[in-house]
């Protein structure tokens, strides 16, 4: 009964409002084991978190060459070391940029697109020179170095960016350990323009934009909660202000912050985020996640 209640609770805020591609057209019996697992996660009948461990053999050993997970384990360990500040036990700018890069690579897509999405084009084309991506250029250069280092092992930039986003979350204390699936093909064609939300969009504009990406209003709030670790690097001069008071940690302070009448000292709130927090269509979900990290984690990993 407790498990059933958890599934029902997750379904209230399903990030994906609909399935598409093979997940929508193929019957369960026609899907691969991995396809079934991904479908179950998207439908909130399976958990997107995992505590399963993996002990990798030596990098140059025949065993590692035969096991695709082995190469990714070495990449993951290297990335995590670049994202987590052990001295302060916080995540750093590379972690938060990696989260954003994963989102920008995947979200430049909608149901009408014939290309785009999580295809690695953020690294493989000139997308990092676009205004909405320019603040990530330095982090992108670092990620390109990782890609070049392991390219001979057959990795894709598309998978690397999504792994980087998940590890960026994990590098922030409190971040959930999100399951990772590899196998995304690369496409160097620049992503379609105009499919990422500007910071001055209203809640209704954001909801309409994400509906075309199959993301529900509740899913938008779960997704935008990643701003708990973000900083506004578009600000002119001085340190980049955070979007809540604890940018080095993965907590629900972001939701608390945006339910307050005015911003806390030193905090910058994007107009779009404030609009979402005030909207009758998304504001109740801000309230649901405020102080309820477990509830937010359950939804955000799906």
Task: Give the predicted meaning of each segment.
Residues 1-302:
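Catalytic cores of secreted/periplasmic or lumenal enzymes
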């Amino acid at each position: 009964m407790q498990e059933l209640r958890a599934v029902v609770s997750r379904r209230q805020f399903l990030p994906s409002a609909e399935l598409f591609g093979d997940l929508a057209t193929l019957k369960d019996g026609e899907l691969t084991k991995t396809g079934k697992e991904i479908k179950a996660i998207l439908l909130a009948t399976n958990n997107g978190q995992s505590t399963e461990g993996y002990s990798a053999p030596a990098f140059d050993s025949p065993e590692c060459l035969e096991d695709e997970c082995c190469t990714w384990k070495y990449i993951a360990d290297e990335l995590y070391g670049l994202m987590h500040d052990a001295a302060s036990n916080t995540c750093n700018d590379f972690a938060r940029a990696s989260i954003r890069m994963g989102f920008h690579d995947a979200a430049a897509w909608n149901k009408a697109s014939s290309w785009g999405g999580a295809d690695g084009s953020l690294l493989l084309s000139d997308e990092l020179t676009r205004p909405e991506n320019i603040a990530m250029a330095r982090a992108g250069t670092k990620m390109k170095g990782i890609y070049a280092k392991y390219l001979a092992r057959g990795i894709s930039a598309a998978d690397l960016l999504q792994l980087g986003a998940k590890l960026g979350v994990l590098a922030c204390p409190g971040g959930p350990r999100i399951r990772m699936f590899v196998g995304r093909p690369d496409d160097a064609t620049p992503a379609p323009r105009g499919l990422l939300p500007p910071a001055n969009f209203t809640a209704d504009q954001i909801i309409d934009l994400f509906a075309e990406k199959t993301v529900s209003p509740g899913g938008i709030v779960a997704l935008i909660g990643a701003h708990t670790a973000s900083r506004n690097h578009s600000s002119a001069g001085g340190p980049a202000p955070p979007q809540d008071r604890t940018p080095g940690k993965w907590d629900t302070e972001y939701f608390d912050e945006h339910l307050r009448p005015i911003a806390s000292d030193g905090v910058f709130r994007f107009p779009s985020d404030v609009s979402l927090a005030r909207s009758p269509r998304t504001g109740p979900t801000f309230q649901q996640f405020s102080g309820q990290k477990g509830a937010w984690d359950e939804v955000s990993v799906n």
